[in-house]
Amino acid sequence: MDEIHGEVSPPAINRSNGALVSDNISQVVEGVDNVERPAKVAKGYSAANRPPPELPHITNNVIPLSNVLKFYTQEAFKQITTLVENLASTKDSEDDSVRKKKFLELIIALRQDFIKIYTLVKWAANSKDVSRFIDLLNWLRMQEFYFDQLTFQLNALNGYSGAKLPNSDLITSLEVLFKGRPQLPSYNYIKIPKISPEKTLEVMQDLNLILMTRIALIDIPKRFINNYVIKDGRIYFSVPNEFQVSITVANDMIIESHDEYTKSPFYFIDFKFLFGINPDTSLITHRDNKIVTKLPRSSHENLEKIVNATLLNQGLHGLYDLLHKFSISFKLYLIAKQLKELQINTRWRNNLQVNYQNGKSLIILNYWSGQYLSKGWKSFIELGIDRNYNLNFRWFKNGKYNVNTELSALFNKHLKNTNEGEEEKDDSTDDIEEPEDLNVDLILNIVVNKHSELLMSKVFNSLDAKLNTTDNPDQISYITPHQLLIKSSPTKSTIFCINPLTGLFYFIDPCPVQNLIAKKINSPPTVVKNKNFVAESDMVNTIVDGLTQLRLEIFNKEIHNRLLTTEWINNDIIGLNDYEISRLSNFFANSLDYNLNVNKIQFYRRKNWPSSWFLINLVSGVTSVTFWWVARIKSVSGEWKIQWIQKLHLNEKTPSVEITDDPTNLNFEFFNNLSTACSNMIIDHMLLEELFKRNIKFLKVDNTALILQKFNIDKIPDDEDTQDTDDKNKPLIYESIIMIYNDNNLLPVYNSATSLFLKIKLINLNNLTQMKLKLFGKLRNLSIRNSPENFLQLNLKIDEIKNFFEIDDLINLSSRTNGSDSASSATTNHLLDKIFNNLNKLNKLIKILDQLNKNKIQIINNSVNDIIIKIDDNLDNLIIKLPEKATDSIKLISEEEVKDGGNPEVKLILDYLNKYLSNYYSDDFFANDEDKFYDGNKKTSIVGIIKYLKEINPILKSVQTIKAKLRKPESAFKLSNGLSKLNFDIKFTTLNLIQYVFHMNYQTPSSSKKIFKDKIVISLSFKNNKFDKVSKNLIKISLKDNLNSKNLKYKKLFELIFKSINDGSMDAHAHQLIKLNYDFLVNSSLVGELMVRIANCFVLYLQAESNGRYNQ
């Protein structure tokens, strides 16, 4: 593009529509390229006379269309030529269709390329317009670049301002024009004649007279009245404690009106401050002329210019306003300087921040800069000039400006006679009392002390309201306005203070807990840590919470130490959830808001306590009251659950135990008694819980004598082992009586009563805790053949004269609870096992004997452990062994089995009976029902079992007879290998199903070494005949189990069996046999004979078979 020279004419204005139209741009957009661009448009030349230059054409990265067509044409020709040559060379090796296919693929590929070229040619027909737009875009970008360069060059011209020539000296030219010569400086080479003293005195006196006249005729500021002196040709205005200024006039004109003042204004002569730094005290003093502060020369000259301008424009009123502001500002400067020194070299270091802003004439003092309530300019004092241009202050705290009349009075005392508008005192008063020095340190002390006092007052009121000290006023009291005496526990007090210098709280002679609480109090509250502003109420609440927490921690630590001293063991692993904690509040008479900052829960236990038993202690930091519970706590699915809990009732007395909830009585005796009371409660609960698990109804007896008298019991039996022991060696720890309801399960009511009594006594012997249990009550109508010595095995004593019994048990709790956790838990949960096992043995002994006697069953002998009875002459005596535990059942044993093993069938039957009794044993066992034996129901009785044994006795005798017969030589049939052809076995499937199993062994001619075995089963079961009251029980003989194809070979055997049964029905016992197809119902007295006959059939069958009468 050609370079553009010359100037650019402004755009033409279209008068018709007011739009600016650029001729050059419009021509370019219209595409007029052949018009030359004008070189100049100045000096009368028009822009339309010369056409603009052509747009430069862009040819970079542009490929001619001819080159593209040439390349693709040559490439297509080359590919066709190469393929034709290749196809000619593969004429013999490739199929003609394959060669044609390759040629077709090449033609299709070239066709696609030429379609693209065709599209490109069509597009090239319109490419001229596209190329022109590209050229135009390039030209516009170049124009933008040239304009940017023009801007840079124009800015560069500003750097040549120093090369300009100076302006002409018009003043000297005018002086030469009027005077004919310039007035050049003399440089003191021309001597000036001296003025005589008389002339000077005369002028001074004239000036004094003129000034007196001027002052008399004009209005002067209020604070200048009576505070000026005219002498030495000037007026001295003195504002007490602020400044002194001297002014004069330049001529002797008498000004009578304000409009003429500009003809003879006042002029500034001298100035000084009537205050300054006292070299003795380094404080700002206001002792008028005794200590003054003069300005440096440069400051004095600047002030002279400003004052003269002010006097010219505003007169004396403007002068006073200016110098009054200047004095107050300078005073602020001196105060700021003093504060800077305090900030660096005094005790205020790191506790004070000063922000002195010259432009605003304001000093901001941020005290307690290290305390979070004031840190970051949240509590400060502003010293500055108010709207009346007086030195004043504002106190900002708790997020707002505060007005404190007491603090304002103290400030005014130190700033008196400084501010405008204050009344001037009489001369006599000024002579007596001089103004005090302005002590910034004292002012700061006043502020921080007052703020500290206010904070401590709020803390006192809030803590007093929280602790509710109406009934106990000694909980909190004042020592000084900055110190509080707080009762941290019933026996200790602490002094809580605030440091006015730093604003931090602390304790005097602190312990580690107090140090932690002080650190917490001096830290921002957790609830407002994310806020920029912390209100004093939040701070006070944090302090009160911290002090409450301190009381809680100290009181809790005292209790903790005393518990540890008295051999309590702390458990800090247990943590109860909110639900479990809420269960504790159910015991409070008044609602108690559980808060970790107000109350604290601790868990303790004794070394000899059962596992999972704990003493829970809750200490209140508000009321200093302790709460105690005894609880059993276990971990369930990772969470601690309270299984049982009972509040420890204080202010109650038991033998040798007296505890109270008065915090002042938490001494060694209290905690020693606490251990005893808790242990008693645990033992008491464990006994009651064990009674509950045994489904025994009970009632704790408070008035023992009345209850015993009601049930005709004279008194509680005395302990023989404690009668001869003095109380010092075996002191009584705890004693209680529980009345137990006897619902005929513990003892027969016929022989006893509906109420039994359990006496519990805890004694301490040689530092070992023992529990003596005594179960006693009425007992009568006994038929036991035991001697008293025999009952000693059960710790049982029976007084048949008084119809009274008692069972004793002595348990060493120390040895039981000192074992391993699992062992101690198992033993301590079964404290009543022995005494109730003995009672259960007595109960069963009475009930079984009563049942046997009522059913006239012969009792051979009885003891506390077993009963020997006679069932039948053909059966051995039966021993009924009583269980050792209440949960066990009785056990039946044959007397012969004890001696020499006995009958195996009888032993098998008894094993079945014992197994059944262990599974289905119930109280119905002692029912007087002869028909209750095992018949498919889950009930039985001892009478039913005895009758069952009588009924099954013929079967057992038949089994013995069959076995004896088969052992005889004439019945012993052998195979070729010596094995018996017939084997007999008895099978007890259940007590109601007995099977006679006959095994038939044989050999086949084809396999003489192989033994085959067939089984023939005859089943016996008991059936109840409801229509016959005399002979109710029948025995069913069934042959249905043999109905199978394998037993067809034994047709002759079954014919013999049925014939034998039919022959038995022809005699006198025919009425006792009932035929049912393959089953027979017979009386128990006939079943033995029939089974022997059936066994003889097997022998007869084998004899006939051996004689060749039957073929397999």
From Swiss-Prot:
The gene is RGR1. Keywords: Activator, Nucleus, Transcription, Transcription regulation. GO terms for cellular component: core mediator complex; mediator complex. GO terms for biological process: regulation of transcription by RNA polymerase II. It comes from Scheffersomyces stipitis (strain ATCC 58785 / CBS 6054 / NBRC 10063 / NRRL Y-11545). InterPro entries: Med14_N, Mediator_Med14. One of its GO terms (molecular function) is transcription coregulator activity. The keyword Transcription applies. Belongs to the Mediator complex subunit 14 family. Component of the Mediator complex. Component of the Mediator complex, a coactivator involved in the regulated transcription of nearly all RNA polymerase II-dependent genes. Mediator functions as a bridge to convey information from gene-specific regulatory proteins to the basal RNA polymerase II transcription machinery. Mediator is recruited to promoters by direct interactions with regulatory proteins and serves as a scaffold for the assembly of a functional preinitiation complex with RNA polymerase II and the general transcription factors. It comes from the Eukaryota. This is Mediator of RNA polymerase II transcription subunit 14. Pfam families: Med14 (PF08638). It is found in: Nucleus.
